[in-house]
Amino acid sequence: MNQKEQNEHSKDFNLRSKLIGIVSITFIAAIALAVIFGGFFFGMKGLFSILGITYASNQTLALFILACFAVGLIIDPLTKIISIILAKSLSLKKTALFAFILYFISNLITICFADYFMQSIYIPDVLLVVISAFMAIIELAFDNQPNREAA
């Protein structure tokens, strides 16, 4: 085998290995996204069945979750910015209260917006408030802002 044939063979092998690498990484990323979405889907399905929320089909539930993600992509960065500004200007107790109110309102807007445009899902108003408050408590518990001494 001469040098030219070796170079062509190594280019072919190099292209093949790159293609296998790209396909493998894409496949792993798709599996990870499917597992994450499946967790959300079955979590929401269980929560909806516990709370008695009715929906027309599994596709409707999947669209509701995607709508919540889409609205959340717009609202959550604004919420984080306001939360950081409040954390710098208020004491710890006031910050926690305002952060809870801010998270509650942003969750309520997100769920109400998705619920409004999805006619095939019915969530009673009381449950909208309960779910938003529960999600706000969870967000507040997992908020990664460093705790500082109360002023």
Curated annotation (Swiss-Prot):
Known InterPro entries for this protein? YrvL
What membrane topology was assigned to this protein in its record? Multi-pass membrane protein
UniProt GO cellular component terms? plasma membrane
What Pfam families does the entry give?
YrvL (PF14184)
Q: Which residues cross the membrane?
A: 22-42, 62-82, 97-117, 121-141
Which locations, inside or outside the cell, does it occupy? Answer: Cell membrane
Q: Which UniProt keywords apply?
A: Cell membrane, Membrane, Transmembrane, Transmembrane helix
> What is the official name of this protein in its record?
Uncharacterized protein YmzD
> Per the UniProt entry, what species is this protein from, by scientific name?
Bacillus subtilis (strain 168)
